[in-house]
Amino acid sequence: MAFTDYETEQLRKALLKETRHCAVTLGMKKTSVDQLTKAVGIAKGSFYKFYESKEMLFFAVLENIHSELYGVADHALSEADSLPPPERTAKAVLAVCRRLSDTGDMVFIENDAKLLLQRLPEDVKNVHYHDDETHIRQLLEKYDLVPNRGVSLAAATVRGLILTVSHKEQIGELYPQVLETLVYGACRELFK
């Protein structure tokens, strides 16, 4: 059955939405193409008109998550343009952490992203995938923010702070205050 352009776009969105849900709740390994196609109401054979493989679909989800997170950081930096660099960057990091906490996407990133990237063809990674440091560097340059000990340390620190999202339960009810303390302290150190 041929799909109209509109149907194709709607089905692509539905596949992405369902895959993101499964990425967080089941994980990539436990999610099957059969399960995804049943959820969106298409035949298994039709799946391959949308994506070459399950991994390519999960990669599209990972790219969407990254784009959303960098959009959140970009918006926070733009909104806080009157603040000094430490507070401005802290607001961006906190916004990203809150987004990850609210969506549950950190489960997918921590549990499946590394395996997913290992399974992708090199040409796909070379064309489409950019590491966090590249994106963080672009945001810092866009807003003329210069960390005093280098972008590599700033990017590694941001990754470390973001990893606290996955330990929210262990930290307990004081997690929001702990996160703010860590983020503001790190940003003051990086941008003093």
Feature annotation, model-predicted:
Residues 60, 74-102:
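Hydrophobic alpha-helical connector segments
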Residues 9-17, 30, 50-74:
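An amphipathic alpha-helix adjacent to DNA-recognition modules
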Residues 22-56, 60:
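Helix-turn-helix
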Residues 1-26, 33-39:
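Basic, helix-initiating cap at the start of DNA-binding domains
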Residues 74-76, 109-119:
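Short linear capping/connector segments at secondary-structure termini
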Residues 67-70, 117-145, 149-156:
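Amphipathic alpha-helical packing segments from all-alpha helical-bundle domains
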Residues 141-186:
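Hydrophobic/aromatic-rich alpha-helical bundle segments in the mid-to-C-terminal region
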Residues 11, 54, 61, 65, ...:
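Hydrophobic/aromatic residues within well-ordered alpha-helical segments
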